[in-house]
């Protein structure tokens, strides 16, 4: 059984009806994965990549836990000026990659396109926009 896919299906079921519940499930899933990778690290993955994975997950979790102190950026945006104002900066591409890890990107992309976002837009950005529009 693919537990990640099953968990993603549960998130999709809640997303349109109870977005706050879907957000909680995403945060819980990220916390569980962060703990799993700390307790049972993949020894074949270079240590720097393992550390980067934790930093990315913690960055996304901080943004999801405290949206009032967060700003979404992209991989090309200089974030230092926003950090000077105490904002937690998170790359939308980073968040989108985690949504793909939950296997819910198809749902979010379809939602964004149904809201009028062009099908030619980058799928990572449609993934992000779908998540934002859903709440």
Residue ranges and their predicted role:
Residues 1-135:
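An N-terminal assembly and electron-transfer interface module characteristic of large anaerobic redox
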